[in-house]
């Protein structure tokens, strides 16, 4: 899969950049220092000139520190900036993957992969600028309990030299809750099938799950198990984060789903990650119609090219219903292999 190929490339960069002693280090709590709300002073390189502005960020911990999510907003030189960073930790490789998304597009960018050594974190990704291949580096440094420094740099010569184009100096604040953007438009009825399609999931839930024991094998044997989870709205509902903890017959399952709305094409992208490796799967992409959501992705399962469908119904009912199904004939027929029924425990509170 392309995701694994790219990750392997970035893994090699991170390993070359890290001392041997750092590769075996348990770094699952490296980002714990970010807990809370931050004031951020930013400098951005625009047409060879640095532009300065200010923003605010909120950090939330996931999986007891093995993942986290940052909301961020600022009034930049080109207008309002609203984004988030999802960070996930792989306990096998001891590496972090950092995924950025901007609310204008609702897409997770390719992961920056790396780790911390001596309180400094370096994370790398590959990209293209005007058709030219480049490396991108994130560096976290000067970390205390109340301050931190972040730089983004670009290299066009394979990492021999770097040019910084984004610098952030952060100071922890106790001014109160992270403020929602003041310029969000009022919600309209059509928003329920668009940017607010998942609003009803906000809060805490009990899960009753049914899993088909063997997929694409003609099986009709199912296993039932139970779990709990929480859904947190982000970007005033135009994104949200679901966390799930399940005690299954094969052991504990911890996962998350990050859902991002793309206002340009009015689709949702649903990203799943499992705590066992921290890797984010290819997104399920789709829409709501009259409260019914269908989301699709292509993947490989058991050497089959598989079309995957997520199906959401009854989101406003006391028990929202979810089904996952696979098709190996281009969507002509479907095999349902995962069913979830939810029961609300508590509404969302900030």
Predicted regions span which residues?
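Bacterial N-terminal signal peptides
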Residues: 8-17
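Hydrophobic small-molecule pocket/channel-lining residues, especially in calycin-type beta-barrels
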Residues: 21-350
């Amino acid at each position: 899969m392309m995701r694994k190929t790219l990750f392997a490339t970035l893994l090699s960069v991170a390993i070359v950049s890290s001392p041997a002693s750092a590769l075996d280090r348990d770094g699952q709590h490296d980002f714990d220092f970010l807990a809370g709300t931050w004031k951020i002073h930013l400098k951005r390189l625009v047409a060879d000139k640095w532009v300065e502005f200010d923003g605010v960020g909120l950090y939330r911990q996931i999986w007891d520190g093995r993942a986290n999510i940052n909301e961020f907003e600022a009034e930049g030189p080109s207008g309002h900036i609203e984004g988030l960073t999802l960070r996930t930790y792989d306990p096998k490789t001891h590496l972090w993957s950092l995924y950025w998304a901007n609310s204008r597009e609702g897409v997770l960018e390719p992961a920056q992969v790396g780790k911390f050594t001596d309180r400094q974190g370096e994370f790398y990704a590959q990209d293209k600028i005007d058709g030219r291949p480049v490396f991108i580096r994130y560096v976290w440094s000067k970390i205390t309990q109340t301050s931190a420094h972040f730089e983004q740099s670009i290299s066009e010569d394979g990492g021999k030299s770097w040019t910084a184009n984004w610098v952030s100096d952060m100071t922890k604040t106790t001014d109160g809750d992270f403020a929602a953007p003041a310029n969000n438009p009022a919600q309209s009825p059509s928003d329920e099938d668009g940017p607010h399609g998942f609003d009803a999931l906000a809060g805490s839930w009990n899960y009753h799950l049914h899993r088909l024991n063997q997929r694409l094998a003609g099986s009709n044997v199912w296993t039932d198990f139970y779990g709990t989870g929480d859904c947190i709205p982000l970007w005033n509902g135009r994104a949200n984060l679901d966390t799930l903890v399940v005690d299954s017959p094969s052991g504990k399952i911890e996962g998350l789903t990050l859902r991002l709305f793309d206002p340009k094409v009015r689709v949702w992208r649903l990203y799943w990650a499992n705590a066992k490796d921290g890797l984010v799967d290819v997104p399920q992409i789709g829409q709501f119609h009259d409260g019914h959501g269908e989301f699709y992705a292509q993947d490989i399962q058991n050497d089959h090219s598989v079309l995957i469908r997520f199906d959401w119904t009854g989101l406003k009912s006391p028990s929202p219903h979810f089904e996952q199904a696979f098709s190996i004939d281009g969507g002509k027929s479907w095999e349902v292999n995962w069913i979830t029924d939810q029961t609300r425990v508590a509404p969302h509170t900030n």
